[in-house]
């Protein structure tokens, strides 16, 4: 049976994610709407859009929703975000806090860069986060 086409970019998301998004934003940006459509269809997706157009949320919300739907998921990293810049990594981590707090899901996030102390790296190995944000030089 074919999927029914919808113009609601939030249609594929869980009620919790929809409620959080609708309470937080006036609506999806074009980058988000097109990105979520492609991602929800299982397509590999590249989102090119200007600064401030919602790319971070476009790229993460589907993964956050998927993790939130599986509270019994096994431990381990499920999403890896490789940032070309350390400063951007910190921004990404900060920008994930609002949706994670608003949705209320138990999803852990860790940041690993060249500045991450060995003790924190060891903790990440023992208790891996659900989402790992890292830089190319730290991805090994």
Task: Give the location of each predicted region.
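Conserved P-loop/Walker A NTP-binding site and adjacent catalytic elements of P-loop NTPases
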Residues: 6, 12-18, 24-140
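Short Lys/Arg-rich cationic patches that frequently serve as NLS/NoLS or arginine-rich RNA/DNA-binding motifs
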Residues: 1-4
């Amino acid at each position: 049976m074919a999927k029914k086409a919808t113009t609601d970019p939030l249609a594929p998301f869980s009620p919790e994610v929809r409620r959080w998004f609708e309470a937080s934003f006036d609506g999806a940006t074009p980058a988000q709407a097109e990105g979520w459509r492609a991602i929800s269809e299982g397509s590999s997706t590249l989102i090119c859009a200007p600064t401030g157009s919602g790319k971070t949320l476009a790229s993460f919300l589907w993964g956050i929703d998927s993790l939130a739907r599986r509270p019994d998921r096994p431990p381990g990293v499920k999403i890896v975000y490789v940032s070309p810049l350390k400063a951007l990594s910190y921004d990404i981590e900060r920008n994930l806090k609002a949706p994670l707090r608003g949705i209320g899901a138990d999803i852990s996030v860790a940041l690993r860069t060249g500045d991450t102390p060995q003790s924190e790296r060891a903790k990440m190995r023992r208790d891996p986060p659900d989402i790992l944000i890292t830089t190319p030089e730290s991805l090994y």
